[in-house]
Amino acid sequence: MKRIIVWLAVMMYTLSGYAQNAPWNFQSKVVTDTLFSKVLNSKRAYTVFLPKSFEQNKEKKYPVLYLLHGMWETNPVWTERGHVKDVMDRLVASGEACEMIIVTPNAGGNIHLEWNGYFDMPGWKYETFFYTEFLPYIAVSYTHLRAHETRSN
């Protein structure tokens, strides 16, 4: 019995060391936060995927991908059901994708008052918020670039 316990302990120690060195075991992270919008007069939630090297090299210019959720969804849907962190860690480790920042804003409003979505409509100026407040905020907070430098046209 003692031999089995020692053998299991050695195996677990060995496997944990392997897992720490596995190429897909990145230390990327997902951050969820809010930004107060003057345009919408409310806090708007967003989720950001930050690559492994972000903490070590915050001055690096990362490309930014904005993923928008669908109707009845919110900002964490891409991390919870889309598994953005796991997918990106594996794609970067395999060389199929470059390191990037992925941002998922919450465009959901009050669905009972027809305030919902990514476009400007009476009582809901989300598009104005997105271009005049959100993009510049993300650019300064996470990429150290001007908003137009973080996206393609």
Where are these regions (language model features)?
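Bacterial Sec-dependent N-terminal signal peptides
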Residues: M1-N21
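A domain-start/cap signature at the N-terminus of enzymes
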Residues: A19-Y62
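Short beta-strand element of the alpha/beta-hydrolase
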Residues: K60-G70
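Cell-envelope and extracellular/periplasmic
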Residues: L68-N75, A139-Y142
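Cap/lid segment of the alpha/beta-hydrolase catalytic domain
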Residues: T74-V77, D89, E96-F129
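Typically the conserved alpha-helix immediately C-terminal to a functionally engaged Cys/Sec
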Residues: E80-G82
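Conserved small/polar residues in nucleotide/adenosyl-binding loops
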Residues: T143-T150
